[in-house]
């Protein structure tokens, strides 16, 4: 009997293997056939290829500044690479990844920085989850803004046209490749990708049923002014207003001493970011004190100024403060005595069309000149989202309280802008727009604390909708169950990192407070309060 059972199991295994091989061959043949069926205006197909799960794809055409030469594919899929003409002087590079384990869902990824790079990691992540996935390069190659010089069409691609065109083409290809087409459409992006998601929310309300937009770069023109204004404040490394990394470390330590406990727990995470308003006069050098262990009065002023909003020439508010507590990161990014590259490129190649423009001269009058231009409405700061709401679509946005690139304060400012414009209280906005503050999260991920929320591949520790923002959006759209919180995890380092602890991140306008009685690593010891 045992021998008979073993033979049956072996036979079944061989049959299943043959079935898998046959299914894979059929899928590969469908991929080959697709190459002959693509006839879309303005679309030039570079190649169509079947890629097996686990293949490490070489990205030979990816610009070096994008920092990615290869990507491991996480599903058997059909890869389509294209160029799409968007005007007589612009085009986008577009890819579509169609997985064999298709769930009937379409998804577009976004970009980062000044765009110019397809987010292949996000494409691998989404396609592994069964989404037909598209990604574009924002209308130019690489991270520099030099392509914008005297070419407003490329700026328009960056503003909205790259993502929207990718969606239009991608949906048509999805319907062509899969007989059933798609039943729901989603978006997943962060930073510039977050802004691109909100551009769809504000202007292309039928592109997506659900948008996940992280750390959004909306209020884009003022964001570039704000990012650029740190250099005139700190000066270069020889200026008497400049702080060394040792001195910024002192400032950051002082912030944590003053603010970490405001949420009830000393855990290296400032949850009570709205209540954090540090002072630094106590750091001024005393007679005989080592200069690396203290600050001059001018340096204290620098530390206060970088934590202040920016205003126009008439005192009008333009962009909020950098949230305190990120000095130990920003001392390498925007407080390092060098101009911030993205802001410099925006002003050189778009605002002033002058490659010789000096970023040290940036001032409030320049902010106003830039804002008045707002090419292709790249600001992405419309407050009336009623058309998106009425279309039945949903948007979930998240932002870290320790973001050193795009201050988390800007998502709070935008939420209030929408509430005031639409005359809508939080419970009304909750029907279609939910914002979560992620304690300790850096820019789009990482940082200190339970920051892994499934927004990117490296932060995927669970596919439970309570612990994965993408699947939370799927559940909201398809089952009508809206997320009340997002569970994040603190992950150990290295391959196969395990969960150290979890925390439920609160829906704005509530905030996380430690109430005990357990350890601060116990998610049940925290409560969301107003």
From Swiss-Prot:
Disulfide cysteine pairs (residue numbers): 31-78, 66-117, 190-444, 259-276, 285-294, 506-528
Catalytic activity as recorded in UniProt: feruloyl-polysaccharide + H2O = ferulate + polysaccharide
Chief site of localization: secreted
GO cellular component: extracellular region
Keyword Calcium appears in the UniProt entry: yes
This enzyme's EC code(s): 3.1.1.73
Full protein name: Feruloyl esterase C
Species whose genome carries this gene: Talaromyces stipitatus (strain ATCC 10500 / CBS 375.48 / QM 6759 / NRRL 1006) (Penicillium stipitatum)
Lineage of producing organism: Eukaryota, Fungi, Dikarya, Ascomycota, Pezizomycotina
